[in-house]
Swiss-Prot record:
GO cellular component, one term: cytosol
KW Disulfide bond (keyword) present: no
Name of the protein this chain belongs to: 2-isopropylmalate synthase
Organism for this UniProt entry: Nitrosomonas europaea (strain ATCC 19718 / CIP 103999 / KCTC 2705 / NBRC 14298)
Alphabetically ordered keywords of this record: Amino-acid biosynthesis, Branched-chain amino acid biosynthesis, Cytoplasm, Leucine biosynthesis, Manganese, Metal-binding, Transferase
HAMAP family listed in its UniProt record: LeuA_type1
Cofactor(s) the protein requires to work: Mn(2+)
Family: Belongs to the alpha-IPM synthase/homocitrate synthase family. LeuA type 1 subfamily.
Length: 510
């Protein structure tokens, strides 16, 4: 029987550190439910000591999830660990992940601690965490620049203290696959009690090697991989969950282990995370990109038609492509609508919220004949972008005529009053944004404007992502509509609402 490879998803914690990827508590819960549906072993829900918002989000995920282990991150400090334990206490199946830096440069310049003091602090942290759960994970931060002898001492000590998982991070994505795999092998061979803990890896993608390094570690004895949906993460991202899982699943002739992931849930998870964060998936992205299973070459097409395995090493349907179920229409009632949301793992906190989204669903059903799961996710994401709308689009009239300068007239509710403006621009979207700015005068910098179709067909909803920056704060706004200009205006106002809101986000981008 194959050994079990633990999949530890950190989309909600490390993935959220991408600039602009901040999620609301409700969005974190939706993603967590999808991860649980997929069969993810451990869900790292956040860093409870970082902010009140992060604490509440971790607690909400712990309340919502029952099958996957819910994990919270904590520095090797009693106060951090207590806060994490408090957030997780609503669930019995939990883990505390604690860490401290072990490289000479970090110990000297950041911690201002001697090596012996660091070991003592690590031991105390693990023992303190075990007051809340026996499932404790320890990470030596900046392990790649740590001295191997000292690293072995620290890890041996925390195993004796009760750590069940040892996570080795490649924090800046600098290591080569042979090096990283060799490091895992060396640690397992040199640490006397290494058989009492699972070795884990957490690789970043700065050189495009996060997945390769993770798989090399697996071949050298690691039995947990920390990863994110779509490889989401700060800088160049983390190891992509979908690539790790499908590499191991597809090459069972090569790997001595396998995961328990339901791979048919991979594409739905990818689309959900992309829609919530506003980070589109590149078309040629492995597994989840739109072109991942497309063949344009005549020779390739002929081969696939004659025998699929000539050019396809896995089936598109095995990872969830083609699973966008046609479900509802203009005659569907509230009960059917509520039931389908529940099946998708979407929980709404009030009847008022359900009514608001149901009305938008009815409006959408009048515009397009076929409503898919992706449309429902987009409706919910669009409605839940900000708890309190300070700016709301009331009407939009955009004109674009060949040979003429495009213009737009917008009417926006600002607080309790209505304001309107007209502006010209290089296109109808530009004119719309300029008109909005005449009213808001927000002095923001537009960093990203992206349009994606949610489903196929000319009547499909378009989902627009707008990224704005102001005074060092970066936010994403989303808008969905069958009218791209309207979706663009909604997205811009969604981002402006986030900038205006004084509510604490689950991971503030300051």
């Amino acid at each position: 029987m194959k050994e079990h490879l633990v999949i530890f998803d950190t989309t909600l914690r490390d993935g959220e550190q991408s600039p602009g990827a901040s999620m609301t508590m409700e969005e974190k819960v939706r993603i967590a439910r999808q991860l649980e549906r997929m069969g993810v072993d451990v869900i790292e829900a956040g860093f409870p000591a970082a902010s009140r918002g992060d604490f509440e989000a971790v607690r909400a995920v712990a309340e919502a999830v029952s099958n996957s282990t819910v994990c919270g991150l904590a520095r090797a400090m009693e106060a951090d660990i207590d806060r994490t334990g408090e957030a997780l206490q609503v669930n019995q199946n939990v883990r505390i992940h604690t860490f401290i830096a072990t490289s000479p440069i970090h110990m000297k310049n950041k911690l201002r601690m001697s090596p012996d003091q660091v070991i003592d602090q690590a031991i105390k942290a693990v023992k303190w965490a075990r007051q809340y759960t026996d499932n404790v994970e320890f990470s030596p931060e900046d392990a790649g620049r740590s001295e191997i002898d000292f690293l072995c001492r620290v890890l041996e000590a925390v195993i004796d203290a009760g750590a069940r998982t040892l996570n080795i991070p490649d924090t800046v994505g600098y290591t080569m696959p042979d090096q990283f795999g060799g490091l895992i092998r060396t640690l397992r061979e040199r640490i006397p009690n290494s058989d009492k803990a699972i070795f884990s890896v957490h690789c970043h993608n700065d050189l495009g090697l996060a997945v390769a390094n993770s798989l090399s570690a697996v071949m050298n004895g690691a039995r947990q991989v920390e990863c994110t949906i779509n490889g989401l993460g700060e800088r160049a991202g983390n190891a992509a969950l979908e690539e790790i899982v499908m590499a191991v699943r597809t090459r069972q002739d090569y790997f001595p282990c396998d995961t328990r992931i339901d791979t048919t849930q991979i594409v739905p998870a990818s689309k959900l995370v992309s829609g919530i964060t506003g980070f589109p998936v590149q078309p040629n992205k492995a597994i989840v990109g739109a072109n991942a299973f497309a063949h344009e070459s005549g020779i390739h097409q002929d081969g696939v038609l004659k025998h699929r395995e000539t050019y396809e090493i896995m089936r598109a349907e095995d990872v969830g492509w083609g699973a966008n179920k046609l479900l509802l229409g203009k005659h569907s009632g509230r009960n059917a609508f509520r039931s389908r949301l529940k099946e998708l793992g979407i929980g709404l906190e009030s009847e008022e919220k359900l009514n608001a989204i149901f009305l938008r669903f009815k409006d959408l059903a009048d515009k397009k004949h076929e409503i898919f799961d992706e449309d429902l996710h987009a409706l919910v994401s669009d409605e839940a972008q900000i708890p309190e709308e300070h700016y709301r689009l009331l009407s939009l009239h955009a004109v674009s005529e060949t040979g003429e300068i495009p213009s737009a007239q917008v009417v926006i509710a600002v607080g309790g009053s209505e304001k309107q403006a007209v502006s010209e621009g290089s296109g109808p979207v530009d004119a719309t944004f300029r008109a909005i700015e005449k009213i808001l005068d927000s002095k923001v910098e537009l960093q990203l404007f992206s349009v994606n179709n949610i489903t196929s067909g000319t009547d499909a909803q378009g989902e627009v992502t707008v990224r704005l920056q102001k005074a060092g704060r970066i936010v994403n706004g989303h808008g969905a509509d069958t009218d791209i200009i309207a979706a663009s205006a909604k997205a811009y106002l969604s981002a402006c609402n986030k900038l205006h809101s004084s509510l604490e986000r689950t991971h503030p981008q300051i």
